[in-house]
Curated annotation (Swiss-Prot):
Enzyme category, top tier: ligase
Example GO BP: prolyl-tRNA aminoacylation
Quaternary data: Homodimer.
GO cellular component, one term: cytosol
Main location: cytoplasm
Family classification: Belongs to the class-II aminoacyl-tRNA synthetase family. ProS type 1 subfamily.
PANTHER family: MITOCHONDRIAL RIBOSOME PROTEIN L39/PROLYL-TRNA LIGASE FAMILY MEMBER, PROLINE--TRNA LIGASE
Organism: Alcanivorax borkumensis (strain ATCC 700651 / DSM 11573 / NCIMB 13689 / SK2)
One MF annotation (Gene Ontology) recorded for this entry: proline-tRNA ligase activity
Protein's UniProt name: Proline--tRNA ligase
Length: 572
């Protein structure tokens, strides 16, 4: 591609409303342009990357035995009513009507549509297992679209759905798809982790998320330094401490703490080690009108997912209001503790081994110091309630945990029969009996993958694309094509030769741009390989090569440049 005939669309300034690196660089590199809130037009450079991501996904889905289909973006609301999701999905589901006043929606996902297709097309166990995928536009009316294409309203997803006669068959396909996802992200050149994930309200036997590691990620990922264990922090088990609870070292003491309504204030004002304090969090109980107190160490955070799974706690998790707490205890939330608390108390495992700790006295402006279990208050029910932290032992017993931020780019799920049962998707088994088909679903955020790749691969000069998804493989930059016939002739020759070999070349044939601008554009775009053609080098029989990830330039003999590039690109 000649730059003079290409919509390069690079800009020097970073747009003020672009917060994350990927959004900034995609705008500056001319990959996308904002049309409206959460809506983006993909320009040529961005689309080239997007199509390469799609192609890798398509190849691996085909290799995994999935069949490609294409379903409508617009879906009839009657399918959503049949599945029961119409009222539950909320305002993210953009509802529309046609000229005949028939209700439709813009599809945020396609479980209903694919299940409707399958119930009409598959009738016998002999047709199973069956796995279908599409790469299609989705629309979710996000209340606050942000971070560019990372969280937009319109986006492209690869969604696949498998159908089975039993859960064993589903488990087999699930593993095939897990391996396919690993192959996809390996080929895309991303540093990622497949992690155990919460199955949520849908339930199901298993769920894994695929996260690209990046500081801008919205999720915390825990993984072991001694094994392959990895999980979303919300799911990672915090093992019980192996140490014994120390014996009491001091008498319990009630202290006036009028200005200490948070753990941070208590620690600061009374010079307490934060790990010697307890937070008391009150939530609604499973029984109507009941409250439950959850205790975690002062330096730990309550894990809402774990708390919600407790039998005594209401689902969904709901924290008690100050009014409800005062009515039950006679004190505000900032003065609560386990001593004489008049309702069910559940303590985290780490709390159970604490001694001489501080907590609220259930009186406004007062705390107990030097509380000890069994001496001052009975040891309550114990459960895993907290988020894991850096340095915790790995739940699989191998190594310790490291916590890093991750961007979720994929999610695979054993759905079970939620949708197939609701929509009556059945087949006849080998005995002629009608059985509901268990389902699996497997999603990849295609547009989000592009942003995640940038978040992980950039420097102060621009994007550093992994080879597999760069918009161009080679940038060909003559220093002064307007005034140097020799540079033009060699550039044209190399361009023709490389293009004939199937190498994607951006030939910067602009006559009015300075060399500095041309080089800055190639670095901003993240093109992996750059050749600079200069008369001075040609006089010495060399050209200048620089890889996008390289710190230094290399001089390469003119007659060896093609072979050199082929070797760099792994084409030999």
């Amino acid at each position: 591609m000649r730059t003079s005939q290409y919509l390069l669309a690079t800009v020097k300034e970073t747009p003020a409303d672009a917060v994350v690196t990927s959004h900034q660089l995609m705008l500056r590199a001319g990959m996308v342009r904002k049309l409206a809130s959460g809506l983006y037009t993909w320009l040529p450079s961005g689309l080239r990357v997007l199509r390469k991501v799609e192609q890798v996904i398509r190849e691996e889905m085909d290799r995994a035995g999935a069949q490609e289909v294409l379903m409508p973006v617009v879906q009839p609301m009657e399918l959503w009513e049949e599945s029961g999701r119409a009222p539950a999905y909320g305002p993210e589901l953009l509802r529309i009507t046609d000229r005949h006043n028939n209700p439709f929606c813009l599809g945020p996902t396609h479980e209903e549509v694919i299940t409707d297709m399958v119930r009409n097309e598959l009738h016998s166990y002999k047709q199973l297992p069956a796995n279908f995928y599409q790469i299609q536009t989705k629309f979710r009316d996000e209340i606050r679209p942000r971070f560019g294409i990372m969280r937009s309203r319109e986006f492209i997803m690869k969604d696949a759905y498998s159908f089975h006669t039993n859960m064993d068959s589903l488990a087999d396909t699930y593993q095939i798809m897990h391996r396919a996802y690993c192959a996809i992200f390996d080929r895309l050149g991303l540093d990622y982790r497949p992690v155990e994930a919460d199955t949520g309200a849908i339930g199901g036997a298993a769920s894994h998320e695929f996260h690209v590691l990046a500081e801008s990620g919205e999720d915390d990922i825990a993984f072991s330094d001694g094994s392959d264990y990895a999980a979303n922090v919300e799911l990672a088990e915090a093992l019980a401490p192996t140490s014994e609870r120390p014996a009491p070292g001091a008498a319990i003491e009630k202290v006036d703490t009028p200005n200490a309504k948070t753990i941070e204030e208590l620690v600061t004002q009374f010079n307490l080690p934060i790990e010697k304090t307890i937070k008391t969090l009150v939530v609604k109980g499973a029984e109507e009108g009941q409250l439950v107190a959850l205790l975690v160490r002062g330096d730990h955070e309550l894990n809402d997912i774990k708390a919600e799974k407790l039998d005594a706690v209401a689902t969904p998790l709901e924290f008690a209001s100050e009014e409800e707490i005062r009515k039950a205890v006679g004190a505000g939330p900032g003065s609560l503790g386990p001593v004489d608390l008049p309702f069910t108390v559940i303590a985290d495992r780490s709390v159970a081994v604490m001694s001489d700790f501080g907590a609220g006295a259930n009186e406004d402006g007062k705390h107990y110091f030097n509380i000890n279990w069994e001496r001052d208050v009975a040891l309550p029910q114990i459960a895993d309630l907290r988020n894991v932290v850096d340095g915790d032992p790995s739940p699989d017993g191998s190594g310790t945990l490291t916590i890093k931020r991750g961007i979720e780019v994929g999610h695979i799920f054993q759905l079970g029969t939620k949708y197939s049962e609701a929509l009556g998707a059945t087949v006849l088994d080998e005995n002629g009996k009608s059985v509901v088909m268990p389902m699996g679903c497997y999603g990849i955020g295609v547009t989000r993958v592009v942003a995640a790749a940038i978040e992980q691969n950039n420097d102060d000069r621009g994007i550093i694309w992994p080879e597999a998804i760069a918009p161009f493989q080679v940038a060909l930059v003559p220093v002064n094509i307007k005034k140097s016939p020799r540079e033009r002739e060699l550039a044209e020759k190399l361009y023709a030769e490389l293009t004939a070999m199937g190498i994607e070349v951006l030939f910067d044939d602009r006559e009015k741009e300075r060399l500095g601008v041309k080089l800055a554009d190639t670095e901003l775009l993240g093109i992996p390989h750059r050749i600079v053609i200069a008369e001075r080098g040609m006089d010495n029989g060399v050209l200048e090569y620089k890889g996008r990830r390289d710190a230094d330039k290399t001089e390469v003999a003119m007659d060896e440049i093609v072979a050199f590039l082929k070797e760099k690109m792994g084409m030999n």
